Amino acid sequence: MFSGKENVSFGVLCLLAGCISTSSCLIHLQAKNIGVLLMMFWCFTGLVNKGINALAFNNSLRLAWTLGCDLSAIIERTWQFGLCCSALCVLQRLEGIASLRQAHSTVWDRKRRLLIDFGVGLGLPALQIPMFFIVQPYRLNVIENIGCSAPLYASVPALFIYHLWRLLVSLVCAVYAVLVLRWFMLRRRQFTAALSSQHSGLSQKKYFRLFALAICERVLVSAGQFYVIIQSLQIGGLLPYTSWAEVHTNFNRILFVPVDTIAHSSLLSLSILRWFSLTPAMALFVFFGLTEEAQSVYKARWKALINLCSSKGKKQTDGRESLDLEAFESHGSKFSVLVQRDTVIC
Protein backbone atom coordinates (compact mmCIF):
# COMPACT_ATOMS: atom_id res chain seq x y z
CA MET A 1 0.00 0.00 0.00
CA PHE A 2 1.42 3.40 -1.08
CA SER A 3 4.56 1.80 -2.50
CA GLY A 4 6.72 3.68 -4.99
CA LYS A 5 5.43 1.70 -7.98
CA GLU A 6 1.82 2.15 -6.88
CA ASN A 7 2.30 5.92 -6.56
CA VAL A 8 3.84 6.19 -10.01
CA SER A 9 1.03 4.08 -11.49
CA PHE A 10 -1.61 6.14 -9.70
CA GLY A 11 -0.02 9.43 -10.75
CA VAL A 12 0.16 8.41 -14.41
CA LEU A 13 -3.41 7.07 -14.34
CA CYS A 14 -4.63 10.34 -12.82
CA LEU A 15 -3.01 12.37 -15.59
CA LEU A 16 -4.45 10.05 -18.26
CA ALA A 17 -7.90 10.02 -16.64
CA GLY A 18 -7.90 13.80 -16.44
CA CYS A 19 -7.12 14.02 -20.15
CA ILE A 20 -9.69 11.44 -21.31
CA SER A 21 -12.38 13.12 -19.21
CA THR A 22 -12.16 16.10 -21.61
CA SER A 23 -12.18 13.96 -24.78
CA SER A 24 -15.66 15.11 -25.86
CA CYS A 25 -15.34 18.76 -24.77
CA LEU A 26 -15.63 20.11 -28.35
CA ILE A 27 -19.01 18.42 -28.78
CA HIS A 28 -20.39 19.95 -25.60
CA LEU A 29 -18.80 23.31 -26.38
CA GLN A 30 -20.70 23.42 -29.67
CA ALA A 31 -23.91 22.31 -27.92
CA LYS A 32 -23.31 24.83 -25.07
CA ASN A 33 -23.72 22.17 -22.39
CA ILE A 34 -22.19 24.33 -19.68
CA GLY A 35 -22.84 21.83 -16.90
CA VAL A 36 -20.93 19.04 -18.66
CA LEU A 37 -18.09 21.42 -19.54
CA LEU A 38 -17.83 22.40 -15.88
CA MET A 39 -17.77 18.71 -14.94
CA MET A 40 -14.85 18.22 -17.31
CA PHE A 41 -13.09 21.27 -15.91
CA TRP A 42 -13.34 20.11 -12.31
CA CYS A 43 -12.50 16.51 -13.16
CA PHE A 44 -9.44 17.49 -15.20
CA THR A 45 -8.22 19.98 -12.58
CA GLY A 46 -8.71 17.62 -9.64
CA LEU A 47 -7.16 14.54 -11.21
CA VAL A 48 -4.17 16.36 -12.71
CA ASN A 49 -3.58 17.87 -9.26
CA LYS A 50 -3.73 14.41 -7.66
CA GLY A 51 -1.39 12.97 -10.27
CA ILE A 52 1.21 15.70 -9.83
CA ASN A 53 1.08 15.28 -6.04
CA ALA A 54 1.52 11.51 -6.27
CA LEU A 55 4.54 11.84 -8.55
CA ALA A 56 6.13 14.84 -6.79
CA PHE A 57 5.90 13.35 -3.28
CA ASN A 58 6.65 9.76 -4.21
CA ASN A 59 8.67 8.48 -1.20
CA SER A 60 9.49 12.12 -0.46
CA LEU A 61 8.54 14.97 1.85
CA ARG A 62 10.55 17.64 0.05
CA LEU A 63 8.45 20.79 -0.39
CA ALA A 64 9.93 22.87 -3.20
CA TRP A 65 7.15 25.46 -3.61
CA THR A 66 4.98 26.34 -0.62
CA LEU A 67 2.60 28.62 -2.54
CA GLY A 68 2.04 25.89 -5.12
CA CYS A 69 1.24 23.49 -2.30
CA ASP A 70 -1.34 25.98 -0.97
CA LEU A 71 -2.98 26.09 -4.40
CA SER A 72 -2.91 22.30 -4.64
CA ALA A 73 -4.63 21.99 -1.26
CA ILE A 74 -7.37 24.42 -2.36
CA ILE A 75 -7.99 22.38 -5.52
CA GLU A 76 -8.06 19.15 -3.53
CA ARG A 77 -10.78 20.37 -1.17
CA THR A 78 -13.00 21.99 -3.85
CA TRP A 79 -12.93 19.88 -7.02
CA GLN A 80 -15.35 17.18 -5.87
CA PHE A 81 -17.78 19.81 -4.61
CA GLY A 82 -17.44 21.44 -8.03
CA LEU A 83 -18.45 18.12 -9.61
CA CYS A 84 -21.61 18.03 -7.45
CA CYS A 85 -22.50 21.60 -8.43
CA SER A 86 -21.88 20.84 -12.12
CA ALA A 87 -24.21 17.83 -11.91
CA LEU A 88 -26.83 20.16 -10.43
CA CYS A 89 -26.41 22.50 -13.44
CA VAL A 90 -27.02 19.58 -15.83
CA LEU A 91 -30.12 18.41 -13.97
CA GLN A 92 -31.51 21.96 -13.81
CA ARG A 93 -31.21 22.27 -17.57
CA LEU A 94 -32.76 18.84 -18.21
CA GLU A 95 -35.68 19.61 -15.90
CA GLY A 96 -36.26 22.94 -17.65
CA ILE A 97 -36.33 21.21 -21.05
CA ALA A 98 -38.65 18.43 -19.87
CA SER A 99 -41.08 20.89 -18.27
CA LEU A 100 -41.27 22.93 -21.55
CA ARG A 101 -40.37 26.12 -19.67
CA GLN A 102 -37.63 26.76 -22.23
CA ALA A 103 -39.95 26.46 -25.23
CA HIS A 104 -40.26 30.24 -25.65
CA SER A 105 -37.01 31.40 -24.07
CA THR A 106 -35.57 34.74 -25.11
CA VAL A 107 -31.95 35.83 -25.49
CA TRP A 108 -32.07 37.28 -21.98
CA ASP A 109 -33.39 33.97 -20.61
CA ARG A 110 -30.49 32.10 -22.18
CA LYS A 111 -27.99 34.60 -20.76
CA ARG A 112 -29.60 34.31 -17.34
CA ARG A 113 -29.35 30.50 -17.45
CA LEU A 114 -25.70 30.84 -18.44
CA LEU A 115 -25.01 33.11 -15.46
CA ILE A 116 -26.85 30.72 -13.13
CA ASP A 117 -24.80 27.78 -14.41
CA PHE A 118 -21.53 29.60 -13.83
CA GLY A 119 -22.74 30.86 -10.46
CA VAL A 120 -23.63 27.35 -9.30
CA GLY A 121 -20.80 25.44 -11.00
CA LEU A 122 -17.99 27.89 -10.22
CA GLY A 123 -19.36 30.39 -7.69
CA LEU A 124 -20.40 27.94 -4.96
CA PRO A 125 -17.05 26.07 -4.91
CA ALA A 126 -15.21 29.40 -4.95
CA LEU A 127 -17.36 30.64 -2.05
CA GLN A 128 -16.31 27.68 0.06
CA ILE A 129 -12.60 28.54 -0.27
CA PRO A 130 -12.61 31.52 2.17
CA MET A 131 -15.18 29.84 4.43
CA PHE A 132 -12.90 26.84 4.88
CA PHE A 133 -10.39 28.99 6.80
CA ILE A 134 -12.87 29.04 9.71
CA VAL A 135 -12.18 25.33 10.32
CA GLN A 136 -8.56 25.18 9.10
CA PRO A 137 -6.33 24.98 12.22
CA TYR A 138 -2.97 25.41 10.45
CA ARG A 139 -1.58 26.00 6.98
CA LEU A 140 -0.75 22.64 5.38
CA ASN A 141 -0.37 18.91 5.70
CA VAL A 142 2.33 17.43 3.48
CA ILE A 143 1.85 13.66 3.48
CA GLU A 144 4.45 11.33 2.02
CA ASN A 145 3.26 9.58 -1.18
CA ILE A 146 0.02 11.62 -1.17
CA GLY A 147 1.01 15.28 -1.29
CA CYS A 148 -0.46 18.56 -0.12
CA SER A 149 -3.76 18.81 1.73
CA ALA A 150 -5.50 21.34 3.94
CA PRO A 151 -6.10 20.23 7.55
CA LEU A 152 -9.67 20.21 8.84
CA TYR A 153 -10.59 20.94 12.45
CA ALA A 154 -13.22 18.24 13.05
CA SER A 155 -16.00 20.12 14.84
CA VAL A 156 -19.65 21.08 14.51
CA PRO A 157 -18.81 24.15 12.34
CA ALA A 158 -16.82 21.84 10.04
CA LEU A 159 -19.95 19.76 9.43
CA PHE A 160 -21.89 22.81 8.26
CA ILE A 161 -19.07 24.61 6.43
CA TYR A 162 -17.45 21.67 4.66
CA HIS A 163 -19.42 18.40 4.73
CA LEU A 164 -23.08 19.40 4.68
CA TRP A 165 -22.68 21.68 1.66
CA ARG A 166 -21.95 18.64 -0.46
CA LEU A 167 -24.79 16.65 1.02
CA LEU A 168 -27.20 19.57 0.55
CA VAL A 169 -26.26 19.95 -3.13
CA SER A 170 -26.66 16.18 -3.55
CA LEU A 171 -30.14 16.41 -2.01
CA VAL A 172 -31.13 19.21 -4.43
CA CYS A 173 -29.79 17.07 -7.29
CA ALA A 174 -32.00 14.21 -6.13
CA VAL A 175 -35.05 16.51 -6.17
CA TYR A 176 -34.31 17.63 -9.74
CA ALA A 177 -33.75 14.00 -10.79
CA VAL A 178 -37.21 13.07 -9.47
CA LEU A 179 -38.73 16.04 -11.33
CA VAL A 180 -37.04 14.98 -14.58
CA LEU A 181 -38.46 11.47 -14.26
CA ARG A 182 -41.88 12.90 -13.38
CA TRP A 183 -41.97 15.09 -16.51
CA PHE A 184 -40.85 12.16 -18.63
CA MET A 185 -43.63 9.94 -17.29
CA LEU A 186 -46.18 12.67 -17.99
CA ARG A 187 -44.94 13.34 -21.54
CA ARG A 188 -43.27 10.09 -22.53
CA ARG A 189 -45.27 9.76 -25.77
CA GLN A 190 -44.52 13.31 -26.93
CA PHE A 191 -41.07 13.53 -25.35
CA THR A 192 -39.07 13.48 -28.60
CA ALA A 193 -41.33 16.16 -30.09
CA ALA A 194 -40.95 18.23 -26.92
CA LEU A 195 -37.15 18.07 -27.22
CA SER A 196 -37.13 19.13 -30.87
CA SER A 197 -39.66 21.93 -30.32
CA GLN A 198 -37.28 23.72 -27.93
CA HIS A 199 -34.27 23.57 -30.28
CA SER A 200 -32.23 22.05 -27.47
CA GLY A 201 -30.02 20.04 -29.82
CA LEU A 202 -30.72 16.94 -27.71
CA SER A 203 -32.08 13.65 -28.91
CA GLN A 204 -33.90 11.42 -26.45
CA LYS A 205 -30.85 9.15 -26.24
CA LYS A 206 -28.48 12.06 -25.55
CA TYR A 207 -30.93 13.55 -23.04
CA PHE A 208 -30.91 10.40 -20.95
CA ARG A 209 -27.14 10.03 -21.27
CA LEU A 210 -26.83 13.48 -19.71
CA PHE A 211 -29.32 12.49 -17.03
CA ALA A 212 -27.47 9.25 -16.25
CA LEU A 213 -24.11 11.05 -16.17
CA ALA A 214 -25.35 13.68 -13.70
CA ILE A 215 -26.86 11.03 -11.43
CA CYS A 216 -23.73 8.89 -11.62
CA GLU A 217 -21.42 11.79 -10.74
CA ARG A 218 -23.66 12.84 -7.86
CA VAL A 219 -23.84 9.31 -6.44
CA LEU A 220 -20.08 8.76 -6.73
CA VAL A 221 -19.17 12.02 -5.01
CA SER A 222 -21.86 11.63 -2.34
CA ALA A 223 -20.73 8.08 -1.55
CA GLY A 224 -17.17 9.30 -1.09
CA GLN A 225 -18.35 12.18 1.08
CA PHE A 226 -20.41 9.89 3.35
CA TYR A 227 -17.37 7.67 3.73
CA VAL A 228 -15.18 10.64 4.72
CA ILE A 229 -17.71 11.86 7.33
CA ILE A 230 -18.09 8.42 8.89
CA GLN A 231 -14.34 7.85 9.00
CA SER A 232 -13.62 11.26 10.55
CA LEU A 233 -16.25 10.71 13.25
CA GLN A 234 -15.01 7.20 14.03
CA ILE A 235 -11.34 8.20 14.25
CA GLY A 236 -11.43 11.34 16.39
CA GLY A 237 -15.02 12.43 16.92
CA LEU A 238 -15.97 16.10 17.08
CA LEU A 239 -13.69 18.56 18.85
CA PRO A 240 -15.02 21.62 20.71
CA TYR A 241 -14.68 24.86 18.73
CA THR A 242 -13.87 27.17 21.64
CA SER A 243 -12.61 30.29 19.86
CA TRP A 244 -10.99 31.49 16.64
CA ALA A 245 -7.73 32.33 18.43
CA GLU A 246 -7.38 28.88 19.98
CA VAL A 247 -8.23 26.97 16.81
CA HIS A 248 -5.83 29.06 14.68
CA THR A 249 -2.88 29.15 17.09
CA ASN A 250 0.42 29.06 15.15
CA PHE A 251 -1.52 28.98 11.88
CA ASN A 252 1.50 29.22 9.55
CA ARG A 253 3.00 25.89 10.57
CA ILE A 254 3.32 23.07 8.01
CA LEU A 255 3.01 19.49 9.23
CA PHE A 256 5.13 16.89 7.40
CA VAL A 257 3.67 13.41 7.80
CA PRO A 258 5.79 10.34 6.94
CA VAL A 259 3.66 7.48 5.68
CA ASP A 260 5.09 5.14 8.35
CA THR A 261 3.50 7.21 11.13
CA ILE A 262 -0.06 6.83 9.77
CA ALA A 263 -2.24 4.09 11.21
CA HIS A 264 -3.04 1.17 8.92
CA SER A 265 -6.80 1.84 9.04
CA SER A 266 -6.25 5.46 7.99
CA LEU A 267 -3.92 4.37 5.18
CA LEU A 268 -6.57 1.95 3.95
CA SER A 269 -9.18 4.74 3.91
CA LEU A 270 -6.84 7.09 2.04
CA SER A 271 -6.02 4.38 -0.50
CA ILE A 272 -9.69 3.59 -1.13
CA LEU A 273 -10.60 7.25 -1.50
CA ARG A 274 -7.81 8.13 -3.90
CA TRP A 275 -8.47 5.18 -6.24
CA PHE A 276 -12.20 5.92 -6.00
CA SER A 277 -11.49 9.47 -7.20
CA LEU A 278 -10.75 8.11 -10.70
CA THR A 279 -14.38 7.01 -11.21
CA PRO A 280 -15.85 10.42 -12.22
CA ALA A 281 -13.45 10.61 -15.17
CA MET A 282 -14.35 7.06 -16.18
CA ALA A 283 -18.05 7.96 -16.06
CA LEU A 284 -17.51 11.02 -18.29
CA PHE A 285 -15.59 8.97 -20.84
CA VAL A 286 -18.03 6.04 -20.85
CA PHE A 287 -21.14 8.20 -21.28
CA PHE A 288 -19.81 10.64 -23.89
CA GLY A 289 -16.30 9.62 -24.95
CA LEU A 290 -17.40 6.43 -26.75
CA THR A 291 -20.36 7.74 -28.74
CA GLU A 292 -20.45 7.82 -32.54
CA GLU A 293 -20.29 11.61 -32.44
CA ALA A 294 -17.15 11.50 -30.31
CA GLN A 295 -15.57 8.85 -32.55
CA SER A 296 -16.11 11.05 -35.60
CA VAL A 297 -14.33 13.89 -33.77
CA TYR A 298 -11.42 11.57 -32.94
CA LYS A 299 -11.15 10.50 -36.59
CA ALA A 300 -11.19 14.13 -37.75
CA ARG A 301 -8.44 15.03 -35.27
CA TRP A 302 -6.37 12.03 -36.36
CA LYS A 303 -6.70 12.95 -40.03
CA ALA A 304 -5.76 16.56 -39.27
CA LEU A 305 -2.68 15.36 -37.37
CA ILE A 306 -1.64 13.08 -40.25
CA ASN A 307 -2.13 15.89 -42.78
CA LEU A 308 -0.10 18.26 -40.61
CA CYS A 309 2.78 15.78 -40.30
CA SER A 310 2.71 14.95 -44.03
CA SER A 311 2.69 18.64 -45.01
CA LYS A 312 5.73 19.32 -42.80
CA GLY A 313 7.54 16.34 -44.31
CA LYS A 314 6.71 17.54 -47.82
CA LYS A 315 8.10 21.02 -47.08
CA GLN A 316 11.35 19.52 -45.81
CA THR A 317 11.62 17.30 -48.91
CA ASP A 318 10.97 20.24 -51.24
CA GLY A 319 13.68 22.21 -49.49
CA ARG A 320 16.23 19.42 -49.95
CA GLU A 321 15.42 18.92 -53.65
CA SER A 322 15.63 22.62 -54.63
CA LEU A 323 18.47 23.84 -56.88
CA ASP A 324 21.49 25.44 -55.21
CA LEU A 325 22.19 28.34 -57.59
CA GLU A 326 25.08 29.68 -55.53
CA ALA A 327 26.92 26.38 -55.99
CA PHE A 328 26.49 26.66 -59.76
CA GLU A 329 27.90 30.20 -59.77
CA SER A 330 30.92 29.31 -57.64
CA HIS A 331 31.98 26.56 -60.07
CA GLY A 332 31.37 28.69 -63.16
CA SER A 333 28.90 26.15 -64.46
CA LYS A 334 26.43 26.89 -67.18
CA PHE A 335 22.92 25.61 -67.35
CA SER A 336 19.90 26.29 -69.48
CA VAL A 337 16.37 26.90 -68.38
CA LEU A 338 13.46 25.92 -70.56
CA VAL A 339 10.49 28.24 -70.18
CA GLN A 340 7.23 27.00 -71.64
CA ARG A 341 4.85 29.68 -72.79
CA ASP A 342 1.16 28.87 -72.85
CA THR A 343 -1.12 30.70 -75.20
CA VAL A 344 -4.70 31.18 -74.16
CA ILE A 345 -7.24 31.75 -76.93
CA CYS A 346 -10.42 33.43 -75.79
Curated annotation (Swiss-Prot):
One of the record's GO molecular function terms: mating-type a-factor pheromone receptor activity
Keyword Membrane listed: yes
Protein name: Pheromone receptor 2
PANTHER family (UniProt xref): PHEROMONE A FACTOR RECEPTOR
Its membrane topology: Multi-pass membrane protein
Domain of life: Eukaryota
Entry keyword annotation includes ATP-binding: no
Subcellular location per the Swiss-Prot or TrEMBL entry: Membrane
Gene for this chain: PRA2
Similarity field: Belongs to the G-protein coupled receptor 4 family.
GO biological process: response to pheromone
Predominant localisation class: membrane
Role: Receptor for the A1 pheromone, a prenylated mating factor.
GO cellular component, as recorded: membrane
Alphabetically ordered keywords of this record: G-protein coupled receptor, Membrane, Pheromone response, Receptor, Transducer, Transmembrane, Transmembrane helix
Protein species of origin: Mycosarcoma maydis (Corn smut fungus)
